[in-house]
Amino acid sequence: MNITPFPTLSPATIDAINVIGQWLAQDDFSGEVPYQADCVILAGNAVMPTIDAACKIARDQQIPLLISGGIGHSTTFLYSAIAQHPHYNTIRTTGRAEATILADIAHQFWHIPHEKIWIEDQSTNCGENARFSIALLNQAVERVHTAIVVQDPTMQRRTMATFRRMTGDNPDAPRWLSYPGFVPQLGNNADSVIFINQLQGLWPVERYLSLLTGELPRLRDDSDGYGPRGRDFIVHVDFPAEVIHAWQTLKHDAVLIEAMESRSLR
């Protein structure tokens, strides 16, 4: 896939992007995941390091891996990511739900037994990921007390707010722990913006920026956001001052705005 490099941005804008990116990639752990959980929930996405992180936890802790994802508006990004992967490109994708594709990765490449893979293949958005996953957990023979939720880092904070909205004050609900697998960071090279993380299977830079800039309006708790005072999809989310400041930096960067508009990303 030939993608036009994203033009270099000011150091202040790069810093602002990384502040927001780190905040969105909510990580309840420091470094590796040491906490023994009862289940890992992998929400369908197309970020290979995140997918691998969920599989690694399930394999190492020998716990069930619940994979959630049907066929939605972003499924083709997973198809493309699989096709470009040096190992996973042998997996059939076209016309298949995200969960079934990721289950093949978990079993064939991470050697997770079929009985430890729980598939939810009907959800098409973040809300359904949470609702249908919780319904599947409720059918488990043994109660799940703690679940590690793994999602595309740009959607991690919203996904956690969605799970907490779905379970509310239910005392029997699992303890939801957030883990994005890694935290993306951008930087400038000589003539373009690149990921400092040298990892296989990341988004194109322009796709990452589109997702990142689209998340903050959704997380707001106002008439246009997803919070209780808006569409009521998520619990209230507090925005740190540095994130608000970073968002203002992005909104007033003419180079960023022009580059994204030229790519139809706004």
From Swiss-Prot:
Record gene name: ydcF
Record PANTHER family: DUF218 DOMAIN-CONTAINING PROTEIN, INNER MEMBRANE PROTEIN, PROBABLE PERMEASE
UniProt protein name: Protein YdcF
Family: To S.coelicolor SCO4629.
Oligomeric and partner information: Monomer.
Function: Binds S-adenosyl-L-methionine (AdoMet).
InterPro entries, per the entry: Cell_Envelope_Assoc, DUF218, Rossmann-like_a/b/a_fold
One GO CC annotation: plasma membrane
Gene3D superfamilies the UniProt entry points to: HUPs, YdcF like domain
